[in-house]
A protein has these predicted regions:
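Acidic/glycine-enriched connector segments
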Residues: 55, 62, 74-148
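Glycine-rich beta-alpha loop segments
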Residues: 21-88, 92-93
Length: 149
């Protein structure tokens, strides 16, 4: 059986012309959860306001049915993943870490899906894979990631 990949609507407009609107059907399941990338200061201290804000952001996002994506390392990246794990709605796979190196040991303990790219700062463009982006603090690197998104 062939999968239908196009939907069509044919109708008459006010002038009597037949119009055909054709568009591809989405191949993304309707139940697929959206991903939000959270960017920020890699050296944020666990006692800082930014770290606590990132923790609460990760928790809130997972509570509302989103996955979180980060650089997978320390600071804000760790906080958002830890917050996601603290959510009552947390499921395995809710945290995605896109590492700039191939060294898996650099990832924080809260990353479920680890993607070691080996792309260094070029991996910043991977934020474009997310459905939305949130920045919490940071500097030039965070700004570069935001611009790439």
């Amino acid at each position: 059986m062939r999968e239908e990949i196009w939907t069509e609507k044919i109708f008459k407009d006010d002038a009597g012309y037949f119009l055909r609107i054709t568009k591809p059907k989405s191949r993304i399941p309707l139940n697929m959860r959206k991903t939000v990338a959270v960017l920020g200061d890699a050296s944020a201290d666990p006692d800082s306001f930014k770290y606590k804000l990132a923790f609460e952001t990760g928790k809130m996002l997972v509570d509302r049915g989103y996955r979180v994506q980060s650089g997978g390392m320390g600071g804000i990246m760790e906080a958002v993943c830890a917050g996601a794990h603290a959510s009552k709605s947390y499921r395995e796979g809710d945290t995605i870490g896109i590492l700039p190196s191939f060294d898996r040991t650099k990832a924080n303990e809260y990353v479920d899906i680890l993607i070691p790219t080996g792309l260094d700062i070029i991996r910043n463009g991977m934020t474009g894979c997310a459905d939305a982006v949130i920045a919490i603090g940071g500097g030039a690197g965070t700004l570069m990631e935001m611009a790439a998104a």
